Swiss-Prot record:
Keywords: Cell membrane, Ion channel, Ion transport, Membrane, Metal-binding, Sodium, Transmembrane, Transmembrane helix, Transport. GO terms for cellular component: plasma membrane. Pfam families: CRCB. Fluoride-specific ion channel. Important for reducing fluoride concentration in the cell, thus reducing its toxicity. It catalyses: fluoride(in) = fluoride(out). Na(+) is not transported, but it plays an essential structural role and its presence is essential for fluoride channel function. This is Fluoride-specific ion channel FluC. GO terms for biological process: cellular detoxification of fluoride.
Amino acid sequence: MDLREVALVLIGGGTGAVARYYLSGVLPVYRSFPVGTLLVNSLASFLLGYLYGLIFWGLDVSRESRLFLGTGFCGGLSTFSTFSYETFSLIREGEYLTALLNIFANVLATIFLVFLGFVLARR
């Protein structure tokens, strides 16, 4: 690991975190459901699936691009800790059904969107 690679992850991660801050601020909650977090996790999952789909289907994506976009940007954009805290808060507030919906929506949507991005990268 060299300093240039660390800088790529740092800049990509910072950019992703700023995008997350903006996007989750635009749609923070809808009837106690944390839409903003679902949006950023879904977008990051799709982008990461697309990036690795491009690589799988033969596009030569440089290590630097993978570090900046995959590890950095997508890592900074997505937020497992916020998802976990919001789910915990919903449970604490007695919103059990909403908490369960949040868990299923985040897990199923993000896995599906990685798959979709991967498949769409082939075209």
